[in-house]
């Protein structure tokens, strides 16, 4: 028996049977993939070779195993000791270690399986895909943005808007004559257009204010603008408070570009009154129009003067949010450059001219060419970056969280006061014992009118009490 089992301690030469088994393993898809994976894994060669030789040699045992009921037989013990002992490398590498998620081979069905990922299934929940879900839903729904432009005529408001969004919003506009301009009052006009860029849809609404500042007497010419902003807040408040709130259209004004004339030494009284009347209702971004009529030193002095007067009169223009601590340095430098550029000195042009072999949008003068998108000539690129690329969502957030919430709080407070007054009147009516309700005070009355109404209410109450006393006396006498 010892002689028959002596082959187990020696290496088995590679014969035809082993070659056939290897060929069979190579043809089998699952075993071939497993064999190749174990063979390629670092440090697994001794295990692979020993295991392969053992699997090949064991079927060649010809002598039957003794049928002894005693499991502690010496032959059994001797035969068990003749099995090859594991080497040092096999003691530390009894089985391939599990792969990390990053080094795990991807399944060939990974592209078709939405749950297949490089993360470990036991450690990966899936809520990291929430930003992608929000992104898909937002892109599918589209975005709304309402921009108001205000300022006197001739400052390039329409041209700048067309240059910002590369579209013609004033295709059907008619220029008024001199007599019509004299009789013209401040109007509110809306231009809506759908813009799509790389699959993202934007519904842009431009609110224009023709006739603003064109009259000789411009007293309270800003009132129609303020009333329009309040009307949009009121309409949104009604829709939000209604039963069906699925398809609420947001027409609130998110930003107001106020154009300041380059002629003069700062802000005019009309500019101050307009911005003070609207700075609690809308995000105001001051614009220094027609910057090509000023030299670079004049532009710098004009900007400093306007910033000083804005601070002096307590005007609250749109404030850029502070950068987060984890923002990169390039973004922080860009944000600082935008803050220092207020008011933005801009130039608008829809004409394409040729400059140094390039076709650019700009204005051609006898002494040279002014390029609209050249940062050295104007702040058009900075304004577009702020308005469209970096702070459009923040403008909408400030409108919703600050300006609209202020209007909403005022509406709720006024409604609460009216309800309290009505309850007090009903209580007094029940105490007086009359079925005739006391007329309510109309909203918006002055203090003198309210005082007069209260006096009349007291007089009516005394007369009712006298009438009840007379009725009781008449009943007692009868």
From Swiss-Prot:
<keyword id="KW-0175">Coiled coil</keyword>
<feature type="modified residue" description="Phosphoserine">
    <location>
        <position position="29"/>
    </location>
</feature>
<feature type="binding site">
    <location>
        <position position="348"/>
    </location>
    <ligand>
        <name>GTP</name>
    </ligand>
</feature>
<feature type="compositionally biased region" description="Low complexity">
    <location>
        <begin position="94"/>
        <end position="108"/>
    </location>
</feature>
<dbReference type="GO" id="GO:0061484">
    <property type="term" value="P:hematopoietic stem cell homeostasis"/>
</dbReference>
<comment type="function">
    <text>Filament-forming cytoskeletal GTPase. Pro-apoptotic protein involved in LGR5-positive intestinal stem cell and Paneth cell expansion in the intestines, via its interaction with XIAP. May also play a role in the regulation of cell fate in the intestine. Positive regulator of apoptosis involved in hematopoietic stem cell homeostasis; via its interaction with XIAP. Negative regulator of repair and hair follicle regeneration in response to injury, due to inhibition of hair follicle stem cell proliferation, potentially via its interaction with XIAP.</text>
</comment>
<feature type="binding site">
    <location>
        <begin position="151"/>
        <end position="158"/>
    </location>
    <ligand>
        <name>GTP</name>
    </ligand>
</feature>
<keyword id="KW-0968">Cytoplasmic vesicle</keyword>
<dbReference type="InterPro" id="IPR030379">
    <property type="entry name" value="G_SEPTIN_dom"/>
</dbReference>
<keyword id="KW-0832">Ubl conjugation</keyword>
<feature type="modified residue" description="Phosphoserine">
    <location>
        <position position="432"/>
    </location>
</feature>
<keyword id="KW-0744">Spermatogenesis</keyword>
<dbReference type="GO" id="GO:0031105">
    <property type="term" value="C:septin complex"/>
</dbReference>
<keyword id="KW-0963">Cytoplasm</keyword>
<feature type="region of interest" description="G1 motif">
    <location>
        <begin position="151"/>
        <end position="158"/>
    </location>
</feature>
<feature type="binding site">
    <location>
        <begin position="290"/>
        <end position="298"/>
    </location>
    <ligand>
        <name>GTP</name>
    </ligand>
</feature>
<feature type="modified residue" description="Phosphothreonine">
    <location>
        <position position="434"/>
    </location>
</feature>
<dbReference type="GO" id="GO:0036126">
    <property type="term" value="C:sperm flagellum"/>
</dbReference>
<dbReference type="GO" id="GO:0051301">
    <property type="term" value="P:cell division"/>
</dbReference>
<keyword id="KW-0547">Nucleotide-binding</keyword>
<dbReference type="GO" id="GO:0005739">
    <property type="term" value="C:mitochondrion"/>
</dbReference>
<dbReference type="GO" id="GO:0007420">
    <property type="term" value="P:brain development"/>
</dbReference>
<dbReference type="GO" id="GO:0005829">
    <property type="term" value="C:cytosol"/>
</dbReference>
<dbReference type="GO" id="GO:0097227">
    <property type="term" value="C:sperm annulus"/>
</dbReference>
<keyword id="KW-0597">Phosphoprotein</keyword>
<keyword id="KW-0132">Cell division</keyword>
<keyword id="KW-0496">Mitochondrion</keyword>
<keyword id="KW-0282">Flagellum</keyword>
<dbReference type="GO" id="GO:0043679">
    <property type="term" value="C:axon terminus"/>
</dbReference>
<keyword id="KW-0342">GTP-binding</keyword>
<dbReference type="GO" id="GO:0030425">
    <property type="term" value="C:dendrite"/>
</dbReference>
<dbReference type="GO" id="GO:0030424">
    <property type="term" value="C:axon"/>
</dbReference>
<keyword id="KW-0969">Cilium</keyword>
<dbReference type="GO" id="GO:0030382">
    <property type="term" value="P:sperm mitochondrion organization"/>
</dbReference>
<feature type="coiled-coil region">
    <location>
        <begin position="447"/>
        <end position="478"/>
    </location>
</feature>
<feature type="compositionally biased region" description="Polar residues">
    <location>
        <begin position="84"/>
        <end position="93"/>
    </location>
</feature>
<dbReference type="GO" id="GO:0005525">
    <property type="term" value="F:GTP binding"/>
</dbReference>
<feature type="region of interest" description="G3 motif">
    <location>
        <begin position="208"/>
        <end position="211"/>
    </location>
</feature>
<comment type="similarity">
    <text>Belongs to the TRAFAC class TrmE-Era-EngA-EngB-Septin-like GTPase superfamily. Septin GTPase family.</text>
</comment>
<feature type="region of interest" description="G4 motif">
    <location>
        <begin position="289"/>
        <end position="292"/>
    </location>
</feature>
<keyword id="KW-0770">Synapse</keyword>
<dbReference type="GO" id="GO:0007286">
    <property type="term" value="P:spermatid development"/>
</dbReference>
